[in-house]
């Protein structure tokens, strides 16, 4: 399969218009197929925020599964979305996609040995809390974040303890508020 015929790479590189025309050429998509399972992650790596949102939405509308774990590094679509700097994102537009990913089963508590938890990736994004506010609103409305997961085996710090110590302006307060509301774990 040529690279641009591979769903992941097509979703990652193409404009929405080009991707849609290519995608419409398929009678049916087998979302269990390894190549198609990765297409949503490819869409979330598209360099254009507008194309990213449109392609991801198209794939979700047609049955893409946000709960897929990408086996290379045990990551999911949240790890992929929570990457990059504010210059690469339209957080307001992408917040709608984020909500669909979470509602569709993307695991906010999935640990990658290489990249950690999705919320660790969100904390590491090169964007201000003001930029990230739309993402925070979606994430902290969820009842299923496990703040008790140990993220540092040396110190024994949990996710909640780590995020409360974040140098960010707003995130520590949001985490404290969330932990009070859910007793630290509500999965």
Residue ranges and their predicted role:
Residues 2-6, 104, 127-187:
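Ankyrin-repeat-protein effector appendages
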Residues 2-10, 30-46, 68-87, 111-126, ...:
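Ankyrin-repeat boundary/"N-cap" motif
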Residues 16-17, 34, 106:
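Intrinsically disordered, low-complexity segments enriched in glycine and mixed charged residues
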Residues 47-50, 64, 101, 127-130:
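Alpha-helix capping and inter-helical loop/turn segments
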């Amino acid at each position: 399969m040529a690279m641009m015929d591979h769903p992941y790479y097509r979703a990652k590189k193409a404009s929405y218009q080009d991707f849609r025309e290519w995608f419409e050429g398929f009678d049916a998509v087998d979302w269990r197929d390894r190549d198609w399972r990765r297409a949503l992650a490819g869409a979330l790596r598209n360099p254009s925020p507008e194309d990213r949102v449109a392609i991801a939405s198209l794939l979700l509308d047609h049955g893409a599964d946000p709960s897929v774990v990408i086996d290379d590094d045990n990551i999911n679509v949240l790890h992929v979305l929570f990457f990059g700097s504010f210059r690469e994102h339209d957080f307001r537009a992408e917040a709608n996609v984020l909500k669909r990913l979470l509602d569709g089963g993307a695991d906010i508590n999935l640990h990658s040995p290489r990249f950690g938890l999705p919320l660790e990736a969100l904390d590491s994004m090169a964007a201000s809390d003001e930029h990230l506010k739309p993402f925070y609103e979606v994430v902290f409305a969820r009842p299923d974040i496990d703040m008790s997961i140990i993220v540092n085996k040396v110190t024994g710090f949990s996710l909640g303890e780590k995020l409360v110590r974040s140098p960010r302006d707003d995130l520590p307060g949001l985490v404290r508020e969330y932990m009070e509301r859910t007793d630290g774990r509500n999965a």
